[in-house]
């Protein structure tokens, strides 16, 4: 946040929050921001309609609006523009359903894109992977970090997930240690 010139507002979550705990904490945080005069929240969602609707519904319930500047942009075009502009991003989490451990901790570049299986969105828009952007044209300075451990974590799947043959989700997380 400092490198981008924004204040950092933290929302502390319990180690493994329930959706209800998450909703309550998010509502409290957003209401606090609203009391400071903030009326909109910006999201990087691209094409998941249900997620966009969820975010809009949650914001509308407290009188705020969501802004989705990347909505419906072709992800192949978006990642090319992102890289061409000079943004630097590292993969911090991969969903083992789509990608193996070797993708955690990789920098997103042309080689990364070429190595992605065909069923994986290049922006990870279906939850295949998550990232941290540490440098680019909007940054005053790069965020300096070292790569820490790559850790496997499992989470139970909801009983409603009938399409799944496994009982749990498996994710690989790459710890980043800020210098």
Each language-model region and where it sits:
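Nucleotide-activated chemistry modules centered on ATP-dependent adenylation/adenylyltransferase
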Residues: 2-179
């Amino acid at each position: 946040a400092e490198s981008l010139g924004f204040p950092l507002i933290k929302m502390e979550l319990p180690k493994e929050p329930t959706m209800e705990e998450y909703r309550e904490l998010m509502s409290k945080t957003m209401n606090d921001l609203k009391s400071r005069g903030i009326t909109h929240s910006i999201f990087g969602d691209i094409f998941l309609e249900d997620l966009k609707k969820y975010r809009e519904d949650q914001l509308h319930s407290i009188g705020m609006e969501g802004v989705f500047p990347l909505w419906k942009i072709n992800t192949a075009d978006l990642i090319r523009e992102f890289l061409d502009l000079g943004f630097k991003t590292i993969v911090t989490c991969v969903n083992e359903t789509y990608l193996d451990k070797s993708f955690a901790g990789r920098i997103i570049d042309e080689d990364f894109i070429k190595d992605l299986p065909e069923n994986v969105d290049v922006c990870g828009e279906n939850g295949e992977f998550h990232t941290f952007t540490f440098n680019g044209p909007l940054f005053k300075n790069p965020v300096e970090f070292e790569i820490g451990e790559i850790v496997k974590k499992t989470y139970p799947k909801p009983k409603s997930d009938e399409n799944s043959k496994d009982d749990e989700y498996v994710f690989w997380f790459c710890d980043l240690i800020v210098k």
